Amino acid sequence: MKQTECTTILVGKKASIDGSTMIARSEDGGRVIIPEGFKVVNPEDQPKHYTSVISKQKIDDEDLAETPLRYTSAPDVSGKNGIWGAAGINADNVAMTATETITTNSRIQGVDPILDPSEGGLGEEDFVTLTLPYLHSAFDGVKRVGYLVEKYGTYEMNGMAFSDKDNIWYLETIGGHHWIARRIPDDAYVIAPNRLNIDTFDFDDSENFATASDLKDLIDEYHLNPDREGYNMRHIFGSSTIKDAHYNNPRAWYIHNYFDPDFGGTPADQDQPFICRANRLISIEDIKWAESSHYQDTPYDAYGDQGTPEQKKTFRPIGINRNFETHILQIRNDVPAEIAGVQWLAFGPNTFNSMLPFYTNVTTTPEAWQTTPKFNLNKIFWLNKLTAQLGDTNYRVYGELEDAFEQKSLAQCHKIQHETDKEVKNLSGKELQDKLIAANQKMSDTVYNNTVELLGQMVDEGHGLMTLKYDLLD
């Protein structure tokens, strides 16, 4: 069974550079490569009957009876372990990313244990497919996932986010059948690694907090709260382990200090705040840099020269060989609703790729992003994997080439996006969608060709650096 170990970044509309809401996540797998694709699920393609592959959980048809909306997704292309839709934006400009694998503790597992997959229940395989096509607001996502978790249960610990043009909500599942959610303030950002992240919680503030109806009673009845005052959900339901200090907390610490150099602290800090404010407005480039980061300019950078070999292996970076798909789901507020939804997407290790902004009001995706299960250099997923594995052999040489490639690609995509926004201003219906499909194709071709060019530059630079060589000076 695949489990993804991700890094989620959330940015409220007053914290972003252009007034948009942004929810982002890197989808990281394990030692086996998991090819990811990009597709549009049109209403006629949405399942009317659904059974999970992993848990064999059958969903009651009544829970799929509502007319589904069109939505984008980034599924596993093999389908062997289910759909794993990962992230997308639907026709009502509601976005969802799911899931972040998070932590738990023995106290709550002794009260409401997660299910064994043999018992049924839902997991990361299922949530996007069963949720996103039925949402008309971000809070609808909280309500629907809460309902599904209470009814069917879950065999995993899950974190997920929902957004519309105004609001972002982050939800975490608790045990097998409970959940909590918090609205992210408009002027705030969140960094959520693979641990239970929500901290302070106000049961009396229904505008900003939501939960399974019996959760407060459950906390009190089973004496789950270690704090003398208030409710800190990370303390109650989460973890504070040595693994957190090496695997989770350092990722958050590094990005907090990138967004606010006065943040301070140490990488292992267990109580880093969930809700934070940056010292500037946050851009797409900031989020991509964060999702690509590997502790640059610290002793913990595996590519750097400041640390010892031991220090370089101390903490897990965000940018890693196991990044298979990364997205930023952006709902813009300065353009018409028909072009407001943008799914920024990249495949492969983030340190060596570039994102591009796909319009989501479309009915199909570029061929290069419809990944094949087997290696195929016509597909951007496999081209990025090859580029990253070559780049990793000598980052000092290849890193500057990648930086130039990424800046060039982002600039070209921004230009295409600006031009398209203006060109389609007075269009609607199929004519509009056709223009957006064409713009997506143009950006896809641009980034694909730039990646091929980068690979060629890396081959040129690396020719003289091979170990197997013998120079004849004659």
From Swiss-Prot:
pH and activity: Optimum pH is 6.0.
Keyword presence, Calcium: no
GO BP terms, alphabetized: proteolysis
Protein name stated in the entry: Dipeptidase A
Alphabetical list of Pfam families matching this protein: Peptidase_C69
GO molecular function annotations of the record: cysteine-type exopeptidase activity; dipeptidase activity
Catalyzed reactions: an L-aminoacyl-L-amino acid + H2O = 2 an L-alpha-amino acid
Keywords associated with the record: Dipeptidase, Hydrolase, Protease
Activity regulation text: Inhibited by Zn(2+), Cu(2+), Ca(2+) and Cd(2+).
EC number: 3.4.13.19
Species: Lactobacillus helveticus
Temperature dependence: Optimum temperature is 55 degrees Celsius.
Entry's family note: Belongs to the peptidase C69 family.
Positions of the catalytic residues: C6
Transmembrane segments: none
Domain of life: Bacteria
Subunit structure: Homooctamer.
